[in-house]
Amino acid sequence: MAVSTRQALLQALSAAGGSYVSGQQLAETLGVSRAAVHKAAAALTAQGYALEAAPRRGYRLAGGDPFCTEAIGDYPAPIYLYDTLESSNRTAKLLALDGAPHGTLVLTAHQSAGRGRLGRRFESPAGKGVYCSVLLRPEMPAANAQTATISAAVAVCRAVKKLCGLELAVKWVNDLYYQGRKVCGILTEAGTDLESGQLEWLVVGIGLNLTSTAADWPDELARKAGSLYPGGPAPVSRAALAGAIARELLALCPAFDCLDEYLSLIHI
């Protein structure tokens, strides 16, 4: 499905993180006329986006972080976006059981009962992180499911580097660090065919702290947790970053052949 000019404009302004972008630059980036940029900007304003236009400065999103599917742009599978969920993984697993297709993306602005490995709680303050789950249906043995977690770590690192210009480090197997603090966790859950030992589905959950601060976490967690942009603002929208991570993960599936890249990211 082609990306509309309106969607492309929203993505470009989201990536600018609230800064002005000139009409000429947007026209060149989007490959359209300045009149088309103006028309798309008017359409976004009519939809309720806090978009500002200023002479000789261009356009900007006042909020800088639209949490909507349009910020994701073109995506090859269904997207489910929520203001709050108990857990994005829980919702994705229910969708898997209901027959949702490969690549289905679930993202939420807040999790009331986010989980990490071994049943640990994952703190998910509203509007301050990327909380998403990707449903995969690879044809592979259940014994190889851990390769999906490894690939998800690579996908997050790739997306963060592309959109934010930041380099993350990996701690085996599913924790990602930035400047010595944990900023991301990955939880992979699976459904298997007991007779064949093959996977029926995988749900890869990703929790990435974007603008959280120590005040958002319990004292014990605050001593070791971190964010990419503590206190904000972030130069990229949560939805756009979630979409980028999901696309990177889908590009690695089903081969999940990225072990060398994963090992090169282990610095902790």
Which stretches of residues belong to each language-model region?
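N-terminal lobe of the biotin/lipoate ligase/transferase fold
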Residues: 2-161, 184
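Long, positively charged amphipathic alpha-helical accessory segments at protein N-termini or as interdomain linkers
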Residues: 2-33, 140-168, 178-266
